[in-house]
Amino acid sequence: MKNTRILQTGALLLSLLASSVMAAVSEQEAAQLGASLTPLGGEMAGNADGSIPAWDGGLSTSAAAVDGKGFLADPYAGEQPLFTITAANAEQYKDKLSAGQLAMFKRYPESYKIPVYPSHRTTAVPAAIAAAAKLSAVNTTPVDGGNGLQNFNASRYYAFPIPKTGVEVIWNHITRYRGGNTRRVVTQATPQTNGSYSLVKFEDEVAFPADMPDLDPAKGSNVLLYFKQRVTAPSRLAGNVLLVHETIDQVKEPRLAWIYNAGQRRVRRAPQVAYDGPG
């Protein structure tokens, strides 16, 4: 009997511990979003030396002229570099340069330069996305060892704006706002060390369940996004199509991907689509 009580007490403690680890943040903590923290969870204040300014709401749509296609002109076109890092002074800035940048200075001492401009914190999101992030903060929790999300369907963006673990930071990147449903034309170059390169051209389409009003909520409940990519050049690859249903909890339901091979005129499942593929 005594052993049974000990086991029951231990199980209860483990349950409480698991609940505390997996719990979303409190309403009081979430209230920091938009106050001392930006709506997406960054520090609103700048740094001590002023090289990183305070966030003041981000870039507004009236910050510069908009062209006929709806693209914003460079609002900082008139700025000049504060200084330029070259092979001659790279040692002075060594603590702020990556190993790759230092290697570039050694390999191309005459031509490789890094002009350093003033920092601007331009990130801004629609009010609905900021509200979604706050909703995520008090509701969303990780499941399946951090490989999935629970209570995320109501918000759909920025799963953990006040992250407590590295996994939650990664989820914020995965669930970031990307401007809604998107269609883009991409040209991909693979340069060689001798300067030669080959080009592959794609048409990409991305759709998010939150921006698909006609989608049955039950069908999209575990889908983060839908992705379609069609190759348009070179001719040997043109017509190939990739379709992906990117799932949220990939332990519960792995990523669904298919490839249409125009040369073979066949559709096949594509389990190899992962990590940095497709490019």
Predicted segments, located by residue:
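Bacterial N-terminal signal peptides that target proteins for export
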Residues: 2-10
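Functionally constrained cores in energy, signaling, and assembly domains
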Residues: 8, 42, 270
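Bacterial N-terminal signal peptides
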Residues: 9-19
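Boundary at the C-terminal end of the N-terminal hydrophobic targeting segment
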Residues: 21-24
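Solvent-exposed N-terminal domain segments of exported/luminal and surface proteins
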Residues: 27-254
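Loop-centered beta-sheet repeat module
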Residues: 236-279
